[in-house]
Amino acid sequence: MARTVPLERVRNIGIAAHIDAGKTTTTERILFYSGLVHKIGEVHDGTAVTDWMAQERERGITITAAAITTRWTKRDPANPSQPLSGAPEYTINIIDTPGHVDFTIEVERSMRVLDGVIAVFDSVGGVQPQSETVWRQANRYNVPRIAFVNKMDRMGANFLKVYNQIRERLKANAVPIQLPIGAEDGFCGIVDLVRMQARIYMDEIGKDIRPAPIPEEMKDLVAEYRAKLVEAVAETDEALMEKYFAEEDLSEADLMAGLRKGTISGQIVPMLCGSAFKNKGVQMLLDAVVDYLPSPVDIPAIKGVLPDGSEVSRRASDDEPFSALAFKLMSDKYGDLTFIRVYSGVLTKGTYVLNSTKNKKERISRLVVLKADERLDVDELRAGDLGAVVGLKDTTTGDTLCDENAPVILESLFIPEPVISVAVEPKTKADIDKLSKALQALAKEDPTFRVSVDPETNQTIISGMGELHLEILVDRMLREFNVEANVGNPQVAYRETIRKPVSRVEGKFVRQSGGRGQYGHVVIDLEPAEPGTGFEFVSKIVGGVVPKEYIGPAEQGIREACESGVLAGYPLIDIRATLVDGSYHEVDSSEMAFKIAGSMALKEAARRASPTLLEPMMKVEVEVPEAFVGDVIGDINARRGQMEGMNTEGGITKVNAKVPLAEMFGYATDIRSKTQGRGTFTMEFSHYEEVPRSIAEAIIAKNKGNE
């Protein structure tokens, strides 16, 4: 089956932002104006197409990244309500991501497979904590982006304030390509700085848009920002810079070409404005997606590793061998869905592929593309496509699927560690099996959700990214798996690390009692590593003192020993273990003996290396009326918080601080009572920090160590 839309006319984009900036409403308007839906869905009515889980519709928040395919033809500048005559049609695959920090993995895995992002900002709130997190995630994967300043109809809307915040707080080269005409109730149109034309909205549903002259009172402002636009574009290209110096302006075609180049390279972030809820600015946003965000062929070829360890890249082309990344798993009444991004080649229904991450074959029995929770069966997925495979057996998030005859492993995605745990137990004995199945299914879908068993109490422990994350998962157990569970109080995910390096620590496991014995012997150095690195293993074995086949088992033993530290049984992080020496026995040595020796060496080294306890620190932003600021700051100090600054606008003060997670449980209730219900806060994980000695001693005593 031939490709219906050339790859150059495909856009894989995400819509990401802080919670309540209007991402889902923006997505709904995109679907409405592109003709995929004929009635506008609203988040607050629970009718949004992309919010299809029961909890999403009840809470008015997006939890999972819904993938949707739609089409768009550029508008006619002379008649902005209509498509441009003879203009080609583009395919746009959209992922609507959650803004709540507890669902950060959904944003992370979306960023990994997208080519471009619309970052939505609230015209009043501007750059908020989760905006910064989303921006960092987009930076991690070098995703080009455009900024859409939404809610221009809100009281206090200020486009240029958001422009300055993006430049200052996100350190991005934001360049307005539009200016709003009016604000709040008076927001009635947009000035297009590329075409130097105003567009006025004549009706409520944003379908009757008319070109108009630029308002007289805006001419100075428009001239100022047009000059900034031209200068920013000229700086992306030497030929344009020469033209700019010669003529002091650039043509519409030059500006569009320069903006596209600058956006794709990450040098420029074009800024647009509108009000998705009031149906203004969305068609121009879609035009900008087509004009400035990359197609799969505009981005660098995806890098991967061959079975022999050498690097290879795969271009976005149907002629290359097939390769794809599984970025999300989902179960529902129809079965298991594995969402994939095809990077190269063609995937056809009825064929076999290799899961190169696990070295297992998978049969492709059914392929679908999605309109939120509606599935459309297709016979194939091609390079650049986002789609889903039904019924894969062994594939999980981050796995590579590829052609059996051209194996490759693509770079996976960053998965943050959970910071909060609770104990769960079934309410009745009849629910025991159902609970186990439910937890397995949910953990398969969500890599930030972990399930473990406490060895001392035998309780089932679930861990996740925050209280809301775990609350929603427990809710899903009841709705989707019909399991009622009792949930314990939240527990902090502490960690352990070391403060000083130790060298040549021995681990020796010897058993000789008739017959074949056991012999494993390793010597390691242990040292602190950079914060955030987790665990690193290095082998400096030379001359075969430890044979190659025993180095892997020794590393495995060391890694497993890190899962339970020496102070209070919490995982050891941010350490580097180097295997420097050892010995073996021709007959008695075995993989198991070296695994045990590695574990013994790590435990002994950690005891000698001045171990210490770490706790998760949260980045907290509180918004309160000025009258309550003193109480809020006093409360943050009482919670062992570290103040980082505050600013006041329009009678509301934003207080920024870092606070230990252990001190933040129940804060939502406390902040409401301290501010007569007028204070709100957001928090997200920042980093791990050493626990003060007096508090650490109490935690260690409670856990009695885990020698």
UniProtKB/Swiss-Prot annotation:
Keyword Cytoplasm: yes
Binding-site residues for GTP, renumbered to this chain: 17-24, 96-100, 150-153
Gene Ontology MF term list: GTP binding; GTPase activity; translation elongation factor activity
Compartment(s) where it occurs, according to its Swiss-Prot or TrEMBL record: Cytoplasm
Assigned keywords, A-Z: Cytoplasm, Elongation factor, GTP-binding, Nucleotide-binding, Protein biosynthesis
Similarity section: Belongs to the TRAFAC class translation factor GTPase superfamily. Classic translation factor GTPase family. EF-G/EF-2 subfamily.
Protein name: Elongation factor G
